[in-house]
């Protein structure tokens, strides 16, 4: 993700500030699916240190706001899912900490 943040690999940007970069997932699992990454390279949640608490708190607080801007309905009727995969057995494929932010209608659940 460092190359995406640096603009060396194209992405569809959702948000950027001095510490955080968010962009659409190239293989979405939901109508709204984007990734939020810290610009600081942290390989995974397993390497998070106490000094990263403010950054991660900002990311978690920002996720639902960005999801609303991308078309998710607000809580409680709508909502959002935030997922962090950590390590091989946790499903992590890219070794740069990232949040998957997903939401939107799920018509397959209606029955």
Task: Show which residues each predicted segment covers.
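HIT superfamily nucleotide-processing domains
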Residues: 1-111
